[in-house]
Curated annotation (Swiss-Prot):
It catalyses: (S)-lactate + NAD(+) = pyruvate + NADH + H(+). It is found in: Cytoplasm; Mitochondrion inner membrane. This is L-lactate dehydrogenase B chain. Pathway: Fermentation; pyruvate fermentation to lactate; (S)-lactate from pyruvate: step 1/1. It comes from Homo sapiens. NAD(+) binds at residues 31-53, 100, 139. It is linked to Lactate dehydrogenase B deficiency: A condition with no deleterious effects on health. LDHBD is of interest to laboratory medicine mainly because it can cause misdiagnosis in those disorders in which elevation of serum LDH is expected. Belongs to the LDH/MDH superfamily. LDH family.
Length: 334
C-alpha cells in the first residue's frame, strides 16, 4: 500500500545523500553563539547550520526553537548535537565556547582555563571538517586565535579571530552619529588587540575620501578642542557599559561575525579588521595574532593590507604584541 507521501510525490532523481555546499557550525550556544546563529540565518548564508555545546537540554531547545522558524528562513537544515560528527563537512566553524572570566581572575588564568576547553574542541572540529575555516570569537580573542592555530594545525589563512571587526564597527557608528551620516559612509579603522589596547588609526579616518585629520589636524590628540579622542575611548568602554547594563554583549558581535562569513562564503574579497598572525610585520618578532586590515574570500584570509601607520601607532601595536606574548609564552600544553 502506497503511503501518502508516495501518492503525493513522484521522484525524478534517485534519492542520495547530498553533501552541503555552505554548511556553518557554531560551537557554543550561549548568548553570543545564538546571536551568531540568528545573524547567519537572517542573511541566508548557510544551507545547513549545526550547533554544538556540552549542555544537551539547552542545545536541543535552541535547535528546536530555530527549526520552528523554518518557514521564515531559507536554511533547509538545522541540526545540533554534543557529538562533533554533526559538524562534518562544515565550510566555516565559529567558536564562541569558553569559560567566563571570574571576578578578580587574571587574564592568564582565564586564558589557561580556555586553553583546556579548546584542547577538546579544536581537534574535534578539524577531525570532521579538515578543510574548514575557523573563526574564533571567544575572549581574549587574539590569544585564543593563536591557541586555535596551534591546536588545529591549520594554515594561518584558515584561522581567523573576529578581532577588531566589531571595534571598528562601533568606531564608525559613533563617528557617524556625531556627523549625522550612515556608518557605511564613515571610514575608519581600529587595529591591534581587541579591547583595551586597540589602536585608532586617525590618519585614515575619512568621509567620501576627505581626510578628517586634514580638516582638524589635532583630531585624535589631547589638544583637540572637539575631543574626538573620546570616540575611541567610548569604543573601548562600550562592551563594559553594555555588560553592566544587560549582563553580556551579543547582537553586535553576532552581526559582525555574519558579516565576516558573508565575505568568505560569497567570495567577496572585502577587507575587514580581523585577527591574524602578524609576526614579521611592523617589527613584531613573536607569533602573536592582532587585527590588521585583511582580505577575506572563499579561501579564507588571503592577504593583509600594508596600512601606513604613524610611529606612535606602530609603537602601540608593538606594545600590544608584547603584552600578548607575555601571556602566550607561559601557556601550557600547546
Amino acid at each position: 500500500m502506497a503511503t501518502l507521501k508516495e501518492k503525493l510525490i513522484a521522484p525524478v532523481a534517485e534519492e542520495e545523500a547530498t553533501v552541503p555546499n555552505n554548511k556553518i557550525t557554531v560551537v557554543g550556544v550561549g548568548q553570543v553563539g545564538m546571536a551568531c546563529a540568528i545573524s547567519i540565518l537572517g542573511k541566508s548564508l548557510a544551507d545547513e547550520l549545526a550547533l554544538v555545546d556540552v549542555l544537551e537540554d539547552k542545545l536541543k531547545g535552541e535547535m528546536m526553537d530555530l527549526q520552528h522558524g523554518s518557514l521564515f528562513l531559507q536554511t533547509p537544515k538545522i541540526v545540533a548535537d554534543k557529538d562533533y560528527s554533526v559538524t562534518a563537512n562544515s565550510k566555516i566553524v565559529v567558536v564562541t565556547a569558553g569559560v567566563r572570566q571570574q571576578e578578580g581572575e587574571s587574564r592568564l588564568n582565564l586564558v589557561q582555563r580556555n586553553v583546556n576547553v579548546f584542547k577538546f574542541i579544536i581537534p574535534q572540529i578539524v577531525k570532521y571538517s579538515p578543510d574548514c575555516i575557523i573563526i574564533v570569537v571567544s575572549n581574549p580573542v587574539d590569544i585564543l586565535t593563536y591557541v586555535t592555530w596551534k591546536l588545529s594545525g591549520l594554515p594561518k589563512h584558515r584561522v581567523i579571530g573576529s578581532g577588531c571587526n566589531l571595534d571598528s564597527a562601533r568606531f564608525r557608528y559613533l563617528m557617524a552619529e556625531k556627523l549625522g551620516i550612515h556608518p557605511s559612509s564613515c571610514h575608519g579603522w581600529i587595529l591591534g588587540e581587541h579591547g583595551d589596547s586597540s589602536v585608532a588609526v586617525w590618519s585614515g579616518v575619512n568621509v567620501a575620501g576627505v581626510s578628517l585629520q586634514e580638516l582638524n589636524p589635532e583630531m585624535g590628540t589631547d589638544n583637540d578642542s572637539e575631543n574626538w579622542k573620546e570616540v575611541h575611548k567610548m569604543v573601548v568602554e562600550s562592551a563594559y557599559e553594555v555588560i553592566k547594563l544587560k549582563g553580556y554583549t551579543n547582537w553586535a558581535i553576532g552581526l559582525s561575525v555574519a558579516d565576516l562569513i558573508e565575505s568568505m562564503l560569497k567570495n567577496l574579497s572585502r577587507i575587514h579588521p580581523v585577527s591574524t598572525m602578524v609576526k614579521g610585520m611592523y617589527g613584531i618578532e613573536n607569533e602573536v595574532f592582532l587585527s590588521l586590515p585583511c582580505i577575506l574570500n572563499a579561501r579564507g584570509l588571503t592577504s593583509v593590507i600594508n596600512q601606513k601607520l604613524k610611529d606612535d601607532e606602530v609603537a602601540q601595536l608593538k606594545k600590544s604584541a608584547d603584552t600578548l606574548w607575555d601571556i602566550q609564552k607561559d601557556l601550557k600544553d600547546l
